[in-house]
Structure formats: C-alpha cells, structure tokens
Amino acid sequence: MPTYRFGKHPRKSDYRTLRFKNYVTAALPPPPSSLNVLDRVYAKLGTSDPTTLFPLDGNDTLGDCTMAALAHAITTYRGILGSKDIMSKQAVVKLYLHLTGGVDSGLNELDVLNYWRSHAVSNDKILAYVAVDPKNHTHVQQAIQLFGGVYLGFQVPHNCLDEFNARKPWTPGPLTNDGHAVFAYGYDQSFVNVLTWGNTQPGTWGWWDECVDEAYAILPPEASNPGFAPGFNITQLKQDLDGVAH
C-alpha cells in the first residue's frame, strides 16, 4: 500500500487578507449546479489521465502538500488556456525546502500564497489571492467557476487515507491533529472534487463543512485582462491590494 503524507500547518490569520465576498457584485450570476474544470483541461491537452497531469510531487515521503497543491493549481490554470505545464517533482521539492529552510516541517497556506504573489513559480506570479468562507458554498462554487479552482486546507479525519485508498469519497469523522492542502477543481450537489496524492478525490459536502478550515481563490496573471471575471470587482481588488502592500 502506498504511503501518503500531510503537512499543512494550522490556518494562519492575517487581518490584511482580502476576502472574496467583498468583490462579488450583483452582476455575478449564481454558479451552475455542477462543474468540472478538468473537463476543459482534458479537452485542451488531449488527455484525461490525472495521474500524469497531477503527480504526487513528493507528497508520499515529504509533508509538502501545500506545494503540491500549488503545482496542481498551475497545471489546471495553464491547461485551461491550452498549455501543458507540469512542475517536476524536483522543482516542487526544491521550492518546498526553500520555504521551510531545508527541513521537512510542512508549511502554512498563507506563507505559500504570499511567496507566490511575490515570486514567480513556474514562470508566473499570481496577481492576488482572496479568502473564501468555506461555509458559504455559493462563494466556493463561484470561485471555482471564475478562477478554475480553490486552494484549500482541511483538518484530516481518521478515515481520510482509508477512503482515499479504497477510492471512496471522503466523509466526516473524528479528526486527527494533521492538516492537508489540496486543490478543488469541481463540484456537484453531493461532492466537492479535489486533486491530491497524484489523483482525483471526491469529498462529501458534509466532509467539507466538518473538515475544511481555509479556502482561497487564486487570481492568475490573466485576471488583469478586461472581462476576465465578469461580476467580480477586480479593479477594486487591485486598489485594495495596493493599499495592503503599502
């Protein structure tokens, strides 16, 4: 049986973190009842094998899930645009150890996202990230629709690995002291679908509500283009971002 690691630190609170809800306008339509962003990625790249596009990235031996989820976000974003960009395991691990100071200590998601906003990873710096309230399912779904996914963290229940290995959806249950970072790419009325450990994995909305403790929409460089996210006030966000930076 393969081994898998976690590695997400407890959620870090920073009052400067911008919030998704503050940029939603009346022009933003309700999200569709179901969405699978990977359908677009697969169509553009001519493959439907998640194990090839979204590899383990060392998360079987290292607690680098926060960095593996970042790499999966990059592959998803670039894939939507028709470009195949898969970070090598060596690049993911090198960046992870750079941020940890060379030790396998895990990371918190805000530090990873702040680094990505200031430094290019796989040739791109993100424009920004915004916190999404995990309890607001509509905003979670709108964030996936607008920005291709949600970078999230959750407290790990005891049944997590058993359900993953059995290819069964994650369900709520007693929690461990571990945290895990994944990238959500889709949903329907019953499940949220994420990328982790070199594969796709569904989780029930009950699991989501019980376990997910942080979620972020990531705005790629293209978000600066006019009309990128209709109904989401990116102009105001950029102004607020300048204020936070100073």
Model-derived features with residue positions:
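Catalytic-core signature of thiol
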Residues: M1-H246
